[in-house]
């Protein structure tokens, strides 16, 4: 629901963006750079991260679009559900577990982020650029 009188109650993101096509055009370039540009993460991994954050935010539209994109890009369909249920038992490379814990905390309780959250990512061999990319996807 867009809460805008000119929009129907079932407006989609594209409908809201149509109010300001110029800004939307710039946003598309930013989004393309974040989701498809150079990164330590594949496009599928970034789509999985975005789907995960969207599920935590209860954004059905974004969760659906990002999870479908992740699947098209080779991510197993059940992986998102496994991550939502329990990061520790999800069937994902252990290097990704602190990344999804970081995303969860940043999404649900951002004021509680501490250096240790980033350090857990670094401890798995990721660098500052990887952390930056995780934050940008979020």
PLM region spans:
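Hydrophobic alpha-helical segments
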Residues: 1-138
């Amino acid at each position: 629901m867009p809460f805008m009188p000119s929009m129907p109650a079932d407006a989609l993101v594209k409908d809201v963006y149509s109010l300001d096509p110029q800004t939307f055009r710039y946003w598309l370039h930013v989004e393309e750079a974040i989701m498809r540009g150079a990164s330590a993460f594949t496009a599928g991994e970034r789509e999985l991260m975005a789907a995960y954050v969207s599920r935590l935010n209860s954004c059905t539209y974004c969760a659906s679009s990002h999870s479908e994109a992740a699947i098209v890009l080779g991510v197993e369909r059940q992986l998102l559900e496994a991550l939502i249920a329990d990061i520790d038992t999800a069937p994902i490379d252990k290097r990704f577990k602190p990344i999804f814990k970081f995303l969860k905390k940043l999404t649900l309780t951002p004021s509680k982020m501490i250096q240790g959250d980033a350090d857990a990512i670094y401890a798995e061999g990721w660098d500052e650029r990887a952390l930056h990319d995780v934050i940008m996807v979020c």
